[in-house]
Amino acid sequence: FRGHDKKDKKIQKK
């Protein structure tokens, strides 16, 4: 899922 920008990048690279 894509919610934040840098916070999600650490969880998923998509």
UniProtKB/Swiss-Prot annotation:
Listed under GO cellular component are:
ribonucleoprotein complex; ribosome
Keyword terms of this UniProt record? Ribonucleoprotein, Ribosomal protein, RNA-binding, rRNA-binding
The keyword Transmembrane is annotated on this UniProt entry: no
GO terms, molecular function: rRNA binding
Query: Mitochondrion: present as a keyword of the record?
Result: no
Similarity comment: Belongs to the universal ribosomal protein uS19 family.
What is the role of this chain?
Protein S19 forms a complex with S13 that binds strongly to the 16S ribosomal RNA.
Q: What is this protein called?
A: Small ribosomal subunit protein uS19
User: Which species?
Assistant: Prunus armeniaca phytoplasma
